[in-house]
């Protein structure tokens, strides 16, 4: 009996050592939230391969996450539901302050520009032609909503905003003639279904701003953030990584620091 106990004890000890020898990263899973500019299924198709790529480069596990609409995404950011998050510039300056998210990366060589789209056969030629029009906007989006609304208000162009769930919803509604115009950004416009894009044209484009932030919640260890940042910054040097970036219309990813979003703070936009 004592021999059995000795072997059993040895088995337990060996098992414990084996468990302790597994890299910590193998047990870690981080929730990566993506702003719902497009449908959840579309975002999952685009971003899941990117997260899988980052898994192979860092050894950490990433769970794709989004929300059914932007207000829900905002609540989850406020409550710190995402370990990592890709968020628009306005969200970043809000939730850096309210929830502690800290930017570590952004799109390379990119300035975020808002656009207003109309049906391809629309008579509208200038932004002033939209006076008194009903216009579709994605709820609380920065360049697709807050910027064009602020510009139109400054120019005394009256309009009636109608809020929809996503950028794709804007493009679909304008393409189908439900609204004469709507707000978006170039990246989602290029990414939207040709069924909608081929029936639209861009009426107006804003000036450029610091783009969306890749940010980490303060609970994520700094060495993990550093490893994720390194992997993202190296994507455009690798054929597979470059192809994945191309799928989301990015040339590359570069380091980002909090102060780089001061141009957005200077707008003093109130949603």
Predicted regions mapped to residue ranges:
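Short loop->beta-strand "edge-of-pocket" segments that line small-molecule binding or catalytic clefts
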Residues: 28-37, 43, 128-144
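Short helices/loops that flank or line small-molecule/ion binding pockets
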Residues: 71-85, 98-99, 128, 168-183, ...
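Periplasmic-binding protein-like
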Residues: 31-37, 43, 109-118, 195-232, ...
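Bacterial N-terminal signal peptides
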Residues: 10-19
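Sec/Tat signal peptide C-region and signal peptidase I cleavage site
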Residues: 22-26
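Extracytoplasmic small-molecule ligand-binding "clamshell" domains
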Residues: 27-91
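Pocket-lining segment of extracytoplasmic ligand-binding domains
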Residues: 122, 132-223
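A structural signal for short loop-to-beta-strand junctions that line the ligand-binding cleft
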Residues: 99-108
């Amino acid at each position: 009996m004592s021999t059995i106990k000795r072997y059993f004890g040895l088995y337990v000890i060996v098992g414990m050592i084996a468990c302790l020898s597994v890299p910590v990263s193998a047990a870690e899973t981080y929730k990566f939230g993506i702003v719902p500019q497009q449908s959840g299924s579309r975002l999952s198709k685009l971003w899941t391969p990117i997260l899988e790529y980052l898994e192979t480069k860092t050894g950490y596990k990433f769970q794709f996450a989004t929300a059914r609409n932007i207000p829900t995404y905002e609540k989850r950011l406020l409550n710190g539901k995402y370990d990592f998050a890709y968020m628009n510039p306005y969200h970043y300056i809000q939730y850096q302050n309210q929830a502690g998210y800290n930017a570590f990366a952004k799109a390379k060589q990119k300035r975020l520009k808002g656009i207003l789209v109309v049906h391809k056969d629309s008579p509208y030629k200038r932004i002033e032609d939209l006076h008194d029009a009903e216009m579709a906007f994605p709820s609380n989006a920065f360049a697709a909503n807050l910027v064009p609304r602020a510009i139109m208000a400054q120019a005394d162009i009256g309009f009636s905003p109608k809020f929809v769930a996503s950028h794709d919803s804007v493009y679909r509604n304008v393409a189908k003639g439900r609204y004469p115009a709507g707000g978006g950004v170039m990246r989602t416009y290029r990414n939207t279904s040709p069924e909608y894009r081929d029936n639209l044209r861009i009426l107006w484009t804003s000036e450029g701003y610091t783009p969306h932030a890749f940010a980490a919640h303060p609970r994520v260890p700094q060495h993990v953030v550093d490893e994720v940042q390194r992997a993202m910054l190296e994507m455009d040097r690798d054929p597979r990584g470059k192809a994945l970036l191309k799928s989301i219309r990015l040339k590359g990813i570069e380091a980002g620091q909090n102060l780089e979003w001061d141009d957005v703070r200077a707008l003093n936009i109130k949603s």
